[in-house]
Regions:
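Vicinal oxygen chelate
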Residues: 2, 92, 98-145
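Exposed loop/turn and edge beta-strand positions of beta-sandwich/beta-sheet ligand-binding modules
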Residues: 5, 38-40, 86, 120
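N-terminal beta-strand motif that seeds the catalytic metal site of vicinal oxygen chelate
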Residues: 1-20, 87-90, 140-145
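Short, flexible, mixed-charge acidic loops at enzyme active sites
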Residues: 66-77
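Active-site/binding-pocket entry motifs
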Residues: 50, 64-65, 142
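Short hydrophobic/aromatic beta-strand micro-patches
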Residues: 10-12, 45, 91-93, 127
């Protein structure tokens, strides 16, 4: 049996609410079903599709009771709690860059962009509240709009 696709990525965060706002208000994900784990968190979905398991899992770190999370997912160094660590970035295919640009501007989210003609892509890079770089790949024609 081979690997067929990326199921989700998880972000440990000390500010669950800031991460929720970023992924729902800027990235346009939706909070959906999450099992009743014994630690704070949210599962985020595209387009209301809950047929799978969410694409982003936000894992809240409770500074008053970190043991619940450690028991479930294991210990992590506080040094690795921001940025992407050894992962450079995560990327999504996307459409409607003008609408996303409006959301970024409205929420004061900085972005870097470039068009890569040989790939037919307009790439936009944004940083989430935990310092994770997210790449959004739009059709190249959207880069001029």
């Amino acid at each position: 049996m081979g690997i067929s696709k990326l199921a989700h990525y998880s972000i440990r965060t000390t500010d669950l609410e800031a991460s929720r706002r970023f992924y729902t208000d800027v990235m346009n994900f939706r909070v959906g079903f999450r099992p009743p784990f014994d630690f704070p968190g949210l599962w985020l979905y595209f387009d209301g599709d809950e047929s799978e398991y969410g694409v982003v899992h936000l894992i809240g770190i409770d500074p008053d009771d970190p043991g619940r999370l450690v028991r479930y997912l294991g210990e992590r160094s506080a040094d690795g709690m921001t940025g992407t660590g050894s992962v450079d970035h995560l990327a999504f295919l996307a459409t409607d860059w003008p609408k996303m640009r409006e959301r970024c501007d409205a929420h004061k989210v900085a972005y870097r962009q470039r068009t890569v003609p040989s790939l037919g892509l307009h790439q936009v890079f944004i940083i989430d509240p935990s310092g994770l770089t997210v790449e959004l790949n739009y059709p190249a024609r959207e880069g001029s709009s």
